[in-house]
Amino acid sequence: MEQNFLSVKGIRKSFGNVEVLKGIDLSLNKGDVLAIIGSSGSGKTTLLRCLNFLETPDEGSISVDGELLLDASDKHSLSDARIRRNRLHFGLVFQSFNLFPQYTVLQNLMLAPSLALKDEVKAIRKEKGRHAAHTYKVEQHAAIREKAKALLTRVGLAEKANAYPCQLSGGQQQRVAIARAL
């Protein structure tokens, strides 16, 4: 039997005395589509924030492709560095795309990976020196640029790489947001 790509078990989250998530379990296979619906205040956004490691559940676990990424009972899995690394497994596209108007489409796609790269470069500089860090930064920045261009091609916007969000239609902006999530 094929293992689930995403497995969520027993996710609970409370804010004060209000329990918002009450033991959520779900399993998804690759290619599955999930719609989360509910009334205002029912915990939809809180669940997504927990799945994206933007919120820490009080209880429960999250596994991706068989790898346990978070176990609320294991303090090691809740370390800041591990949570930041695990965030890279997920991308969300919300109704409002929040593209940065001062950046081109390509720059919008490259922003988050470039910011994550800064932490890596700092660690390499400390461990291996300035030259090694610079070399790594240049190589990784080129890889980020190429991946961003490939994603733009994938969503049919390669020709819009140097455009600004205000120059795109709403649908094109949404495709940029999808590429950014990927």
Residue ranges, per PLM feature:
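ABC family nucleotide-binding domain
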Residues: Q3-L182
